[in-house]
Amino acid sequence: MVIADASTKLLGRARWLAWATIVYNMIEAVVAIVAGSAAGSIALIGFGLDSIVEVLSAIVIVWQLNGVSEDRERTALKLIALSFYLLACYVAVQALFDLIGQTKPDTSLVGIGLAIASVIVMPILARAKRHTGKQLGSSTVVADSNQTKLCAYISIILLGGLIFNATIGWWWADPIAALVIAALAINEGRQAWKGETCTDSC
């Protein structure tokens, strides 16, 4: 009885962390896309689009925790994988156009603030998910913690690109950061296509 109660409590915590990630990523996506469009920053826009796909991926995690059928889960993961691939193609092509055309994005203080917030929040969420997943014995929750950790890395890349552009005028740092985000999105898509959210290789 005690073990069952502890397991139920841990499962509830895992669900809460998944929903917290969904809500944060939704806010992150809106702010990033609006700020990116205003500043002409493809890195910020790509970051926002990645956050949207991350929301879909997190919803699959919630489904898994609620015992959704494997067939529905596999279908959802395939669609998420395709979304990551489309995102990567769009961001990569736009970043290359910006590099070739030497399109200089404006400084985005909102974008820098968002990136700093994500660099702080994502590692905290990742650690909490990993700890909960290990206690629960759930590879799904542990894998999701790796996905969240990857989001923190993407946030660091975004922050670097935005700061370099704002402080020393390295306009090309923005599209370069966008290309790195596109490459990471391809990796996320590959993992989702294989039926994973992210593996321990992240």
What are these language model-derived features?
Residues M1-C202:
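Alpha-helical transmembrane cores and adjacent cytosolic helix/loop segments
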